[in-house]
């Protein structure tokens, strides 16, 4: 049975880079942001509930209006809870189905910016936090999303703080542009295999 890791971090922290490097090293990673979009696009119940909540225009020409949904979601914590309450239960079930086909592997991952807030942390065995300084995160996100600093800061304020996430994490990866990532990821994999060995020993005893 595979050990499941949850990869999280704030906007612009570099979660996707870490997930990609893990995949290169043979660890498949469920990208919850991408997979949730697929679930939303194909689940008629979600489509109806989002239309009832946000308005029919949230699906423009049959496709999800991601900008409108994001604007609604980040407008308040109440809006975020409403949207997440519709989407997250289906994504959890989708992840369970995905991971059930990978039981023969040692390690699999799930990447989510809101791993802890969404309750996805309950689906994994340990949390990996990707940390980057706030200024660098804002710079990366502004460049990537073609958004203003204020828009990015609004999103950051809507999420759990880095300090809280680090406290919950079993392992922290520093992605500040100076500390090399690959040695840290190799250290993470070694840490996970130690955990696997411990779990196997405990089970055999």
Curated annotation (Swiss-Prot):
ATP binds at residues 12-17. Its EC number is 2.7.1.24. It is found in: Cytoplasm. The keyword NADP does not apply. It holds the Pfam family CoaE. PROSITE patterns: DPCK. It catalyses: 3'-dephospho-CoA + ATP = ADP + CoA + H(+). GO terms for biological process: coenzyme A biosynthetic process. Pathway: Cofactor biosynthesis; coenzyme A biosynthesis; CoA from (R)-pantothenate: step 5/5. Keywords: ATP-binding, Coenzyme A biosynthesis, Cytoplasm, Kinase, Nucleotide-binding, Transferase. GO terms for molecular function: ATP binding; dephospho-CoA kinase activity. Residues 4-203 form the DPCK domain. Catalyzes the phosphorylation of the 3'-hydroxyl group of dephosphocoenzyme A to form coenzyme A. Belongs to the CoaE family. PANTHER family: BIFUNCTIONAL COENZYME A SYNTHASE-RELATED, DEPHOSPHO-COA KINASE-RELATED. NCBIfam families: dephospho-CoA kinase. This is Dephospho-CoA kinase.
């Amino acid at each position: 049975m595979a050990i499941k890791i949850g990869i999280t971090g704030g906007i612009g922290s570099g979660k996707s880079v870490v997930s990609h490097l893990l995949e290169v090293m043979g660890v498949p990673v469920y990208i919850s942001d991408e997979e949730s979009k697929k679930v939303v696009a194909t689940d008629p119940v979600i489509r109806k509930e989002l239309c009832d909540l946000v308005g029919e225009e949230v699906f423009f020409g049959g496709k999800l209006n991601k900008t409108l949904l994001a604007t609604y979601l980040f407008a308040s914590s109440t809006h975020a809870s409403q949207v997440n309450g519709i989407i997250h239960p289906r994504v959890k079930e989708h992840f369970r189905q995905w991971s059930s086909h990978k039981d023969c592997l040692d390690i699999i991952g799930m990447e989510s910016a809101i791993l802890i807030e969404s309750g996805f942390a309950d689906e994994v065995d340990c949390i990996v936090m990707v940390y980057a300084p706030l200024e660098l995160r804002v710079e990366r996100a502004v460049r990537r999303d073609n958004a203003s600093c204020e828009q990015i800061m609004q999103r950051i304020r809507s999420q759990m703080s880095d300090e809280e996430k680090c406290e919950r994490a079993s392992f922290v990866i520093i992605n500040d542009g100076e500390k090399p990532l690959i040695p840290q990821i190799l250290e993470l994999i070694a840490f996970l295999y130690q955990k696997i060995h411990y779990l196997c020993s405990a089970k055999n005893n």
